[in-house]
A protein has these predicted regions:
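Conserved radical SAM core fold
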Residues: 59-64, 188-192, 196, 235
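Active-site acidic/histidine proton-transfer and metal-coordination neighborhood
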Residues: 12, 48-49, 65-153, 240, ...
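An N-terminally biased module of ancient metal coordination in phosphate/nucleic-acid-related enzymes
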Residues: 1, 16-25
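Acidic (Asp/Glu)-rich catalytic clusters
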Residues: 15-20, 35-55, 74-87, 108-118, ...
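Active-site clefts of carbohydrate-active enzymes
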Residues: 189, 199-201, 223-237
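Acidic-and-aromatic substrate-binding clefts and catalytic sites of carbohydrate-active enzymes
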Residues: 4-11, 28-41, 61-72, 97-104, ...
């Protein structure tokens, strides 16, 4: 479970809920909360709740502008260092924004260099085109879809695929052996359908072929990580939030062919 599932709750509460819901591990989204950047504190939480930290999500620019400074390359390097320090093997990163000129022009080289020096997999995440007044805006560079990029590891997010009008199953098939990581969620439609929000629905509540994708990966003995990244901010209580998280766990275990707890 990604700690972003219960944002803005404190990090320890995220670990508690992940444990109560029945998840096997945690992805830590680096935010303004100091605990998300403190390897010692994170290891203590991992030990306390018996949940390994599987991955680190590098800071997202729009939410964490000044976390670890303003240089996006430094942010990615620090994320890899944090991953190594807490025993995670993967860092999830979004493609650069076009206005991050030096970073975007050298992004794939930077990713490969950090992977080589740190031993951490950098899973570049699929995003979606931005639109303004019905027109596409080139917000990302090299782009929003890493399908054909020269990188060794990618992350598949179903909500992003939905907003982009793509099929998560087709993306998984196209990514092939480069698919390292999955953000388990769903979406109900694309921007062309009038959808404007990145929904991160409970899997099975949208229109993406999430079940089919998990079953496809299970059939080929895929060994990456499936990490829940659903939006529970509308939950009126922890009980309601926990219900959504447990539903997500059951969905994943069912379609991956794993025994439910």
């Amino acid at each position: 479970m990604s700690t972003s599932c219960v944002y803005p709750l404190e990090t320890e509460r995220a670990f508690q809920l992940a444990r109560e819901a029945g998840f096997d591990g945690v992805e830590v989204m680096v935010t303004n909360a100091a605990t998300t950047r403190d390897a010692v504190a994170l290891r203590k939480l991992s030990k306390k709740y018996h949940l390994p930290i599987l991955s680190i999500h590098a800071p997202v620019l729009l939410l964490t502008t000044f976390v670890w400074g303003r240089d996006p390359q430094v942010k990615l390097e620090r994320s890899a260092e944090l991953a190594a320090a807490v025993g995670a093997d993967t860092v999830v990163v979004h493609p650069p924004f076009r206005w991050q000129k030096d970073y975007s022009e050298n992004f794939l080289e930077i990713v490969r260099r950090i992977e080589t020096t740190s031993g951490i997999n950098i899973g570049v995440e699929n995003m979606f085109p931005w639109k303004a007044k019905g027109r596409s805006v080139a917000a990302y560079a090299p782009g929003w879809d890493p399908s054909d990029w020269d990188c060794d590891n990618v992350t598949l997010d179903f909500s992003h695929a939905s907003l982009a009008g793509q099929s998560g199953l087709e993306l998984a098939q196209h990514f092939g052996d480069r698919l390292r990581h999955i953000h388990l969620c769903d979406g109900s439609g694309s921007q062309d359908d009038g959808q404007i929000f990145d929904e991160h629905l409970i899997p099975g509540m949208g229109t993406q072929p999430v079940a089919e994708t998990l079953e496809y990966l299970a059939a080929k003995n895929w060994d990456g990580a499936v990490v829940a990244e659903i939006n529970t901010r509308r939950a009126k209580s922890d009980a309601e939030r926990l219900k959504a998280l447990r539903k997500t766990v059951r969905f994943a275990r069912t379609h991956l062919g794993l025994h439910t707890r």
